[in-house]
Amino acid sequence: MILFPAIDLKDGQCVRLVHGLMDQATVFNDDPAAQARAFEEAGFEYIHLVDLNGAFEGKPVNAAAVESILAAISIPAQLGGGIRDLATIEMWLEKGVRRVIIGTAAVKNPALVIEACRKFPGRIAVGLDAKGGRVATEGWADVSDLTVLDMAGRFEDAGVAAIIYTDIDRDGALQGLNIEATVSLADAISIPVIASGGLSSIEDLKKLIAANCSGIEGAISGRALYDGRLDPSEALKLLRGVA
């Protein structure tokens, strides 16, 4: 099981939001590349990057910061936020992103996901962000009538590498992962699922492991790592023994 440390980029800085609200951003590091290096040095094997401005504007905004991170690390990175077309997907893959995450565009234009998976097999993930069980888009500003399961089912045969499932109501709030919903999703589909939103402590990871769900690839942690509530060495040691 993989623990992905999150670097959320706003105005070139490494921040954390609460419930996805841009006006509730806490700056944790004004040098994202240094933060990424620190995560690699701590033993993490895969980094999760989000261009927050890009998610709201529908196009890459923090490209310079992302490129500086990619230049600074030797471990793989996955990137989401503002990726709405094939040209942007191709650009990021060529620049060294291992896996591109399609969020809003996956909901509004599912054909893009299918085409991208065909063109770049194993390199495309879908980000499904839920508010009250419904899929939210446009940087979480719009909530649709679709359930996460409805949406995930559309990509069952597309060749999606992973689904990143975020519970917005918990994101950045340290309320604990929504393990029940994550397990339900992972059990219902064949695509690997990554849990995100609310991870608060090592206890969350223990509960995730205890759920014994083979469809869960890992979890994303942001604020708990920055706040020191989750010790990297303890967490990584726990997860390394789990397939």
UniProtKB/Swiss-Prot annotation:
Its main location: cytoplasm. One of its GO terms (biological process) is L-tryptophan biosynthetic process. The keyword Transmembrane helix does not apply. It comes from the Bacteria. It is an enzyme of class 5 (isomerase). Its EC number is 5.3.1.16. Belongs to the HisA/HisF family. This is 1-(5-phosphoribosyl)-5-[(5-phosphoribosylamino)methylideneamino] imidazole-4-carboxamide isomerase.
